Amino acid sequence: MNSSTALMCFALLLISPLCLGYSDEDREADSRRIAEIIQNAQDDDSKINSTQELLDIYRRLYPTLSLEDRENIDKFVNEHTDAIVIDGVPIQGGRKAKIIGKIVSPAAKGLAVGFFEELGSKIAQLFTG
């Protein structure tokens, strides 16, 4: 009985990575989506509105990246976001962009556009190089 249970657990460990994760197809789809986002974001408002989608793609890609790549992009993102902490614990979602909002001043809009362009460039490099 013990050996059959152990064998079953071992089989599940071998099979589970095949069912979960970030497949090559997912990576290719995200690569195309990054290129599409960058190409279609012509004006400042569309760039600002597309920033969250870039961050979502980065979060999906995160487990497959090298430690150096993760630290590089995390440092960049953390410099441009504030942690929202209640009683020392981040709220669900954890971070809020400093530079993105419904009404953005011209100076903040420039920062938001710069953030979008730099983040898009960093993520696109992960797919091309």
From Swiss-Prot:
GO BP annotations, alphabetical order: cellular response to heat; defense response to bacterium; innate immune response; response to bacterium; response to cold; response to heat; response to mechanical stimulus; response to oxidative stress
Glycosylation sites: 49
Family, per entry: Belongs to the Turandot family.
Organism: Drosophila sechellia (Fruit fly)
Keywords: Antibiotic, Antimicrobial, Glycoprotein, Immunity, Innate immunity, Secreted, Signal
Signal sequence interval, chain numbering: 1-21
One Gene Ontology term, aspect cellular component: extracellular space
Record's protein name: Protein Turandot A1/2
Highest taxon listed in the record's lineage: Eukaryota
Organism placement in taxonomy: Eukaryota, Metazoa, Ecdysozoa, Arthropoda, Hexapoda
Coiled-coil zones: none
Compartments it resides in: Secreted
Function field: A humoral factor that plays a role in stress tolerance; gives increased resistance to the lethal effects of bacterial challenge and stress. Regulated by the JAK/STAT pathway and NF-KB-like Relish pathway in the fat body, upd3 in the hemocytes and Mekk1 in response to septic injury and consequent immune response.
